[in-house]
Amino acid sequence: MSRSIHKGPFIDVSLLTRIEALNTSGKKEVIKTWSRASTIIPDMIGHTIAVYNGKQHFPVFVSDQMVGHKLGEFVPTRTFRTHVKGDRKARR
């Protein structure tokens, strides 16, 4: 179920304050965050946000196409590992 419109998008308070502080100062810094559930808003465009995937922080450069999506959508948490080709032959 989607979020109610009258509540507005979810954005972590500490992330929002850091974005607003960078917008007023005009600096460009990488912002570390663990909040994968935060929605990308237009104020974040042009900033690089390092999103945690459970192991390390991955930098995500926010563009205008990303507005409305969640930060966690752009950083995968699982890596797909295929079986070694030699293992397939050994099983035959």
UniProtKB/Swiss-Prot annotation:
The keyword Chloroplast applies. Signal peptide: none annotated. It holds the Pfam family Ribosomal_S19. GO terms for molecular function: rRNA binding; structural constituent of ribosome. One of its GO terms (cellular component) is chloroplast. PROSITE patterns: RIBOSOMAL_S19. Keywords: Chloroplast, Plastid, Ribonucleoprotein, Ribosomal protein, RNA-binding, rRNA-binding. GO terms for biological process: ribosomal small subunit assembly; translation. It comes from the Eukaryota. InterPro entries: Ribosomal_uS19, Ribosomal_uS19_bac-type, Ribosomal_uS19_CS, Ribosomal_uS19_SF. Protein S19 forms a complex with S13 that binds strongly to the 16S ribosomal RNA. NCBIfam families: rpsS_bact. This is Small ribosomal subunit protein uS19c. It comes from Porphyra purpurea.
